[in-house]
């Protein structure tokens, strides 16, 4: 009698679901983003999540501070202390809404965004772990540090916590820290020279980056080739007919490390008028941080020029279209995010006002100039000249390091 040959049991190559092949609890398929309400910080988190393939599988939470009136003077406090103090002040005086209305302040509606609550996020991570696997937590901004570190402390077996920007606390409170190199400027010889000896022990960071720190050149963001292709298509009708070269001007606002006012506005408008002959079109955008005195000067000097269009701030925001269709960029030196996005396109980027920057901002601009990524805007340029460089690719490189860190833990992201 001939033996009966039974079929071999199925193997992974025969279509076993990936989650079982890798282990039931080792695949990350969702993320939580913890923001602070500032576009520059939240954009970095969403950009990383997008690069990791979880753009459609993340939930945004926010750590919100009271705003308006005396609250603008209390931002140096830890957010929990600030909220308690604001509550006491409101109970004592009871007229905060009337005061805001009298000053013309509009309430900020965040009803569509969840308030970041450590207990809620930890409970969700624990209770859904067996069904949905580990939870990726990505946070950015000073107010998110205590929230993100508490989540890791309370649910370390169920979460992987990434903090973007140096948290100025012990880095072992997070699984991974992604921060620009210029955050370590205080440890450089140039930085040390600018710090009095008695203050050096108090200036953070105090130690060089260790193995779970990812260093970037600039800020993370959502701009990649796919985003640019999509924006080019969406804005084709508006930008394709414009005379070339199209020069996009992005104006930010002064910061603690980059102070300026009407002086920079006058410098910028003078330089733009000088290069106008070599421009086909100029598109100018202001940010929410742009002081009115700056925007007024620019509008007065350039608003009636037929080659110039100034965005009025109404939706839709043309920013993505600008990145896709511009032939060159002029960006104020204060905005690391805007400069990083422009430098991800490989197109000419000119920076105005870098000489007004101090501290770590000088290190950032120096690194870009040394790489040939940016040039100073002097007003003597021929804007039709095209030059290029290897585009900054910080977001993709940071995402790759996240993959590596997860693999060391035996986890991985959904394919």
Language model: regions and residue ranges:
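N-terminal mitochondrial targeting presequence
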Residues: 1-29
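Active-site and donor-binding regions of nucleotide-sugar-utilizing enzymes
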Residues: 33-209
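Short internal beta-strands
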Residues: 59-62, 177-179, 282-288, 350-353
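A nucleotide-sugar donor-handling region in carbohydrate enzymes
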Residues: 171-263
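Core catalytic architecture of nucleotide-activated donor-dependent transferases building glycoconjugates
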Residues: 219-248, 254-309, 390-394, 398-415
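Donor nucleotide-activated moiety binding/catalytic core segment of transferases
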Residues: 299-337
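Conserved donor-binding/catalytic loop of nucleotide-activated donor transferases
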Residues: 324-326, 344-348
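C-terminal amphipathic helix plus adjacent low-complexity
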Residues: 357-415
């Amino acid at each position: 009698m001939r033996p009966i040959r039974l079929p071999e049991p199925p193997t992974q190559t025969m279509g076993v679901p990936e989650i079982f092949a890798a282990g039931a609890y080792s695949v990350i398929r969702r993320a939580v983003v913890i923001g602070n309400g500032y576009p520059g910080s939240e954009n970095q988190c969403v950009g990383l999540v997008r690069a990791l393939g979880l753009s459609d599988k993340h939930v945004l939470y926010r750590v919100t501070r009271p705003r308006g009136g005396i609250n603008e003077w209390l931002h140096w406090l830890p957010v929990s202390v600030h909220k308690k103090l604001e509550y006491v002040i409101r109970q004592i005086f009871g007229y905060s809404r009337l005061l805001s209305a009298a000053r013309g302040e509009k309430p900020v509606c965040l009803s569509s965004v969840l308030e970041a609550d450590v207990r809620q996020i930890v409970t969700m991570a624990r209770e859904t772990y067996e069904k949905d696997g580990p939870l990726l937590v990505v946070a950015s901004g000073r107010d998110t540090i205590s929230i993100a570190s508490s989540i890791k402390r309370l649910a370390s077996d169920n979460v992987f916590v990434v903090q973007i920007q140096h948290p100025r606390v012990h880095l072992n409170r997070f699984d991974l820290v992604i921060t620009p190199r210029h955050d370590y400027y205080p440890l450089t010889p140039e930085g040390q020279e600018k710090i009095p000896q008695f203050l050096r022990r108090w200036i953070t960071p105090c130690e060089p980056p260790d193995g779970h720190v990812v260093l970037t050149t600039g800020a993370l963001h959502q701009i990649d080739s796919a985003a640019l292709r999509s924006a080019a298509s969406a804005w084709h009708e508006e930008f394709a007919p414009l005379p070339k070269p199209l020069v996009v001007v992005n104006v930010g606002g002064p910061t603690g490390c980059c102070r300026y006012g009407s002086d920079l506005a006058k410098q910028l408008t003078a330089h733009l008028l000088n290069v106008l002959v070599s421009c086909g079109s100029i598109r100018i955008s202001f940010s929410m941080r742009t002081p009115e005195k700056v925007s007024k000067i620019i509008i007065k000097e350039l608003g009636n020029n037929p080659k110039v269009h100034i965005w009025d701030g109404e939706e839709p925001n043309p920013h993505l279209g600008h990145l896709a269709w511009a032939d060159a960029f002029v960006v104020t030196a204060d905005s690391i995010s805007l400069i990083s996005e422009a430098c991800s396109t490989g197109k000419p980027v000119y920076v105005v006002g870098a000489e007004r920057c101090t501290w770590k901002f000088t290190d950032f601009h120096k690194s870009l100039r040394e790489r040939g990524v940016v040039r100073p805007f002097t007003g003597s340029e021929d804007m039709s000249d095209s030059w290029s460089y290897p585009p900054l690719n910080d977001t993709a490189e940071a995402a790759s390091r996240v993959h590596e860190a997860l693999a060391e833990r035996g986890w991985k992201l959904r394919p």
